[in-house]
Amino acid sequence: MFYIIGVGPAPGFITEKAAQILREADCVFYEDYTGPIDVETLRRYARSPPTRLTRRDLEDESGRRVLECLSRGKTAVLATAGDPMLATSHAALISIARSRGYSVEVVPGVSIVCAAFSASCLSIYKLGGVATVTYPRGGVYSARPYELVEQNLARGLHTLLLLDVREDGVFMPPRDAAEIMLKLEEREKRGVFDKGRPVVVVPKLGWGGRPAYLPLGELLGSDLEGPAVFIVPGGLSPVERECIEALSVLKSR
């Protein structure tokens, strides 16, 4: 049996079902490139020492070590931060395991999407989509975040922006994301990411961070650290505005 479990965005978010699976699994693996994971929690529950797998292990080598465990008739678990299949990072491994006759179960966890909207007090019913602010690839910045925010602003919808992870495993800090967004504005020139654009930043959710509501330009000198997510509001209702300003450590002027 192969389980993929989500342990939530930070310590204390693991579900009882995920904890029980860790207690019973023969092989426990985890990855920390899609999000920060609390390894101490894994060690506390797992009966065997957790093994870290890199992106290369899971993608380039198609989860070879997981499949080797399964081939010995043992139960394997792969733990991820947040909700394991909110993105499709591990869909290929599920397909491979099933094609070889292994049973697979996905155990959901608290996702960064739900947690960010809960922490920021914004309505998830107004979420118009999710994009990722990425570092340039080959010197080119992806326009996807710009285009999605532009579409959602026209419809009065919120946009959730995830932030990239560097090749060395360092999570993009909000100041880098703000710089990239402003560079996209310099290129596109349609008034989507100007310095005065109000954004909600949710840094280190569950690790002591609190949401910040402020103009995009003020993040250039920010010391907020990653991992973090941005929400670009598509227009705040009076209730949303009052709530986010009450919860936020910083407020737009």
From Swiss-Prot:
Catalytic reaction annotation: 2-[(3S)-amino-3-carboxypropyl]-L-histidyl-[translation elongation factor 2] + 3 S-adenosyl-L-methionine = diphthine-[translation elongation factor 2] + 3 S-adenosyl-L-homocysteine + 3 H(+)
One Pfam family linked to the record: TP_methylase
EC number(s) stated in the UniProt entry for this protein: 2.1.1.98
Keywords from the UniProt entry: Methyltransferase, S-adenosyl-L-methionine, Transferase
CDD domains: DHP5_DphB
GO BP, one annotated term: methylation
Pathway: Protein modification; peptidyl-diphthamide biosynthesis
Disulfide bonds: none
GO molecular function: diphthine synthase activity
Binding site for S-adenosyl-L-methionine: 83, 86, 111-112, 163, 205
Enzyme class: transferase
Subunit structure: Homodimer.
Family to which this protein belongs: Belongs to the diphthine synthase family.
Its job: S-adenosyl-L-methionine-dependent methyltransferase that catalyzes the trimethylation of the amino group of the modified target histidine residue in translation elongation factor 2 (EF-2), to form an intermediate called diphthine. The three successive methylation reactions represent the second step of diphthamide biosynthesis.
Protein name per its UniProtKB record: Diphthine synthase
Organism: Pyrobaculum neutrophilum (strain DSM 2338 / JCM 9278 / NBRC 100436 / V24Sta) (Thermoproteus neutrophilus)
